[in-house]
């Protein structure tokens, strides 16, 4: 047991998206397991939670960010420090869906990378009767980004854990690929070019296990 606790990997996750898409509700449902009904625009909130994901302990540092345009100047700061990003839109708002590409482009520009760990999250899937964005549109956008896609509901807790777990998995995969590339540049073994997601469409993979033994810190 002592060996398992000698090193606790911390992951800096950032939740981004337009105003009113449910970023805070999604984050609080994941961290505290309850739904926040009232809409109170966020400036910036940070949460920590310890989880076991794929038999590996992870300390998640989750930053819930402002969606309002007046706080746009703060974006580059958290984009510089984030290791992975949940790109959240609401299925009831086409405008929020169209904003996702802008957020993604800004992340790549700030990181100076061709690709970076992200997951496209279509929130409010419980409001099917108000849907403006089809599931296939979200899946196609994620495929274009080379990342995973998941539809969620913070209200009834659908796929909430999966969204955050999938982002941690994307970060782990990205870091391994970067290490492989580093070994190649120093004469090591094979691998793909920096930041590429080799193999099949990430959305063809299984949903993965549930998050066991999570602790809010």
Swiss-Prot record:
A lipid is attached at residue 214 (S-geranylgeranyl cysteine). One of its GO terms (molecular function) is GTP binding. SUPFAM superfamilies: P-loop containing nucleoside triphosphate hydrolases. Residues 185-194 have a biased composition (Gly residues). InterPro entries: P-loop_NTPase, Small_GTP-bd, Small_GTPase, Small_GTPase_Ras-type. It comes from the Eukaryota. GO terms for cellular component: plasma membrane. The keyword Ribonucleoprotein does not apply. A lipid is attached at residues 210-211 (S-palmitoyl cysteine). Residues 181-200 are annotated as: Disordered. It catalyses: GTP + H2O = GDP + phosphate + H(+). GTP binds at residues 17-24, 64-68, 123-126. A motif (Effector region) lies at residues 39-47. Its EC number is 3.6.5.2. It is found in: Cell membrane. NCBIfam families: small_GTP (TIGR00231). This is Ras-like protein. The lineage of its organism: Eukaryota, Fungi, Dikarya, Basidiomycota, Agaricomycotina.
């Amino acid at each position: 047991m002592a060996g398992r606790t000698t090193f606790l990997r911390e992951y800096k996750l950032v939740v981004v998206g337009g105003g009113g898409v449910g970023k805070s509700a999604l984050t609080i449902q994941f961290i505290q397991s309850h739904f926040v009904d009232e809409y109170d625009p966020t400036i910036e909130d940070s949460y920590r939670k310890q989880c076991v994901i794929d038999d590996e302990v992870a300390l998640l540092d989750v930053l819930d960010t402002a969606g309002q345009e007046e706080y746009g100047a703060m974006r580059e700061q958290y984009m510089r420090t984030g290791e992975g990003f949940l790109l959240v839109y609401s299925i009831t708002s086409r405008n929020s869906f169209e904003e996702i590409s802008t957020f993604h482009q800004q992340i790549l520009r700030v990181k100076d990378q061709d690709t970076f760990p992200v997951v496209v999250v279509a929130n409010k899937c419980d409001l099917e009767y108000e849907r403006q964005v089809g599931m296939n549109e979200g899946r196609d956008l994620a495929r274009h980004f080379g990342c995973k896609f998941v539809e969620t509901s913070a209200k009834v807790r659908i796929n909430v854990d999966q969204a955050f777990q999938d982002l941690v998995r994307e970060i782990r995969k990205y870091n391994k690929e970067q290490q492989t590339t580093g070994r190649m540049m120093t004469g090591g073994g094979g691998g793909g070019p920096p930041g590429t997601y080799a193999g099949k469409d990430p959305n063809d993979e299984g949903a993965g296990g549930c998050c066991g033994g999570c602790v809010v810190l």
